[in-house]
Amino acid sequence: MNSALFLAKLPEAYAIFKPIIDILPVIPVFFLLLAFVWQAAIGFR
């Protein structure tokens, strides 16, 4: 499996997507915050 090596060294064509790839691990945290805000909005029923 060289996928980790491939992802660590992206080709030049995908260099513009690097900021997006850096943000990807944070997305589950946003879902957690969204769930909390949603529950707060409906009053924690």
UniProtKB/Swiss-Prot annotation:
Cellular compartment(s): Plastid, Chloroplast thylakoid membrane
Propeptide: 1-8
Residues spanning the membrane: 23-43
Keywords: Chloroplast, Membrane, Photosynthesis, Photosystem II, Plastid, Reaction center, Thylakoid, Transmembrane, Transmembrane helix
UniProt-listed GO biological process terms: photosynthesis
Topology in membrane: Single-pass membrane protein
GO cellular component: chloroplast thylakoid membrane; photosystem II reaction center
NCBIfam families, alphabetized: PRK02553.1
UniProt family annotation: Belongs to the PsbK family.
Protein name: Photosystem II reaction center protein K
Species name: Pyropia yezoensis
